[in-house]
Amino acid sequence: MGEHQNVKLNRTVKAAVLTVSDTRNFDTDKGGQCVLQLLQVDNVEVSDAHYTIVKDEKVAITTQVKKWLEEDVDVIITTGGTGIAQRDVTIEAVKPLLTKEIEGFGELFRYLSYVEDVGTRALLSRAVAGTVNDKLIFSIPGSTGAVKLALEKLIKPELNHLIHELTK
């Protein structure tokens, strides 16, 4: 595995960011804006058409993700709707679309959340990642702390390697 740790892609990585929230708009979407800022640092491209907000509704989430799966993106990151509240349905919308689940992502995210961020409240997270054909999907909580942890500790360090493995 060590031979792939510093994989460099010969192209720009294209991402889509979906915020799932009944209350956020583009001015108040701190989680989605945090994703955009952290991706921009690594020259990951997110066009205006690939950043949006939908309500906590399974059909709305599924429809948007399916639309982006048909477009020229490498990775889709959803924020919000991953907890256990009645309205938290992101996982129910995304998981059935996955070809393969990357179980280690959710396990490591919850572990790091426990150790570095929220303690035992980490057990409330149902964060998930997986693949759909040659695309990656990550569904993470919407708090900026969770977004930073997921992107800085897990997603960004492995993104090129994951894309390389999916497309080789």
UniProtKB/Swiss-Prot annotation:
User: Could you read off the lineage of the organism from its UniProt record?
Assistant: Bacteria, Bacillati, Bacillota, Bacilli, Bacillales
Family statement drawn from the similarity comment of this UniProt entry: Belongs to the MoaB/Mog family.
UniProt xrefs under InterPro entries: MoaB (IPR012245), MoaB/Mog-like_dom_sf (IPR036425), MoaB/Mog_dom (IPR001453), MoCF_biosynth_CS (IPR008284)
Q: Which PANTHER family match?
A: MOLYBDENUM COFACTOR BIOSYNTHESIS PROTEIN B
Keyword field: Molybdenum cofactor biosynthesis
At the top level, the lineage of the source is Bacteria
The task this protein performs is described as: May be involved in the biosynthesis of molybdopterin.
Protein's recorded name: Molybdenum cofactor biosynthesis protein B
Question: What Pfam families has UniProt attached to this entry?
Answer: MoCF_biosynth
| CDD domains the record matches | MogA_MoaB
Pathway, per record = Cofactor biosynthesis; molybdopterin biosynthesis
Q: Name one GO cellular component term.
A: cytosol
Q: Which organism is it from?
A: Staphylococcus aureus (strain MRSA252)
